[in-house]
Amino acid sequence: MTTKFTTRAVPLALLLSAVAANAGPYDIPANVQTVAKAQITAGALEAPIRFLASDALEGRGPATRGDTLARLYLAAELQSLGYLPGGEKGGWEQTVDVVGTTAQLPAVWSFTGKSGNVDLKLSDDYIAGSGVQSPAAVIENAGLVFVGYGIEAPEYQWNDFKGVDVKGKVLVMLNNDPDWDPKLFAGKTRLYYGRWVYKYESAARQGAAGVIIVHTTPSAGYPWQVVQSSWGGEQFELPAESEPRIQLKAWATEDAARRLVKAGGQDLDKLIAAARSRSFKPVPLALKTSIKVENKVSRVRTANVAGLLPGSD
C-alpha cells in the first residue's frame, strides 16, 4: 500500500526540511544543520530503496511474506531514527483490511456500431480492472459517450458533463487534466482531477457503467507497458462502503481509442480539440457494448507502519 512507502519517507522529509529551513520562527541551529547534512548521502537514500524494491520482498503484496518483511524493516528504521511506536496497542502497526480483486478479462472486448464493429484485444489494446468487489462485473448493451476529461471542477468553471445523463453508459475519457494554461488546473502540474482514480470516481457519481481512459505516454507520464504490468494482476483497495461504483475501470491505447471513436462515427482528434474548451459537451458515440468479467475476490489484512516523534514544546 502507498502509505507503507510514504511512512518511511517521513524521517527523511523531516531531515531535509530541517536542512532547508533557515529563516522564520523555526530556525535550525547551524550545528544541527551540519550534522543533518552529513547524514544525507546517496548511500543513505539508496539503501532502503534497494531493499524495499528487492526480489526478496516478492513485490510486497498485502498479507504476503514480503509485506511482513517490509513492515518489520520500516519499524526498525523508524526506531533507529528515534521514533516511538505510533500504532495500535503500543505497537508500530495500524491494522488495515483490504479487498483483493482479480478480474478474468475476456481475450476480446467487442463493440458494435453503425459504422462498423471493433474488437479490442486484451493487453494489446485494452486492460481493465473490476470496479466492484463482487463475483462478477457486468455491462449489458451499454452505449458509449465521449466526455472529454471527465472533470467537474466548479473552482475552474469546468464541467465536462453539463448535466447530460450518462447513467448506464461506458464513458470514454482523456487522461490527465487541461494543462495548457498555468491558470487552469495549475498548468503542467497534475492535480487530482488528472488522476485515473478521480476519473473513475467521477464517472461513478454520474451513474456510469464503466470508463475507458485513453492512454498516451505524454498524458500518463509512462508507456503502455506500465499499464499492462500494473493492471495485469490482483488489485487491492479498501472495502467498499456506500459510495457509487462503476462496473469496469478500463484503459485503451490511443490506436484502439481511435478505432473505437471512428466506428462510433466521430474523429478522435476533433473530439480532443473540442474537449479543450469549457463549452465542451458530451458526445454520444454510435456504439454499444456488453461485457462480463468474472472476479476472484479475497479479503485480507495488512497494516500501515506508524511512528511518533515527540516534540519539545
Feature roles, as predicted:
Residues L52, L78, T253, R301-D313:
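Acidic/His- and Gly-rich active-site-bordering loop/insert found
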Residues Q39-E46, G61-L72, G86-G87, I139, ...:
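Soluble non-cytosolic domains of exported or imported proteins
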Residues T2-N22:
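Gram-negative bacterial Sec-dependent N-terminal signal peptides
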Residues L120-E241, R245-L248, P310:
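Extracellular/luminal Protease-associated
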Residues R50-E58, A75-G86, D97, T101, ...:
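Sec-exported extracytoplasmic/periplasmic mature domains
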Residues D55-K183, V283-A286, V293-V297, R301-N304:
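Noncatalytic luminal/extracellular "stalk/propeptide" segments of secretory-pathway proteins
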Residues A36, R205, A209-P218, Y222, ...:
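Long, well-ordered, tryptophan-enriched scaffold segments
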Residues A23-G86, P310:
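N-terminal hydrophobic or amphipathic helices/low-complexity stretches enriched
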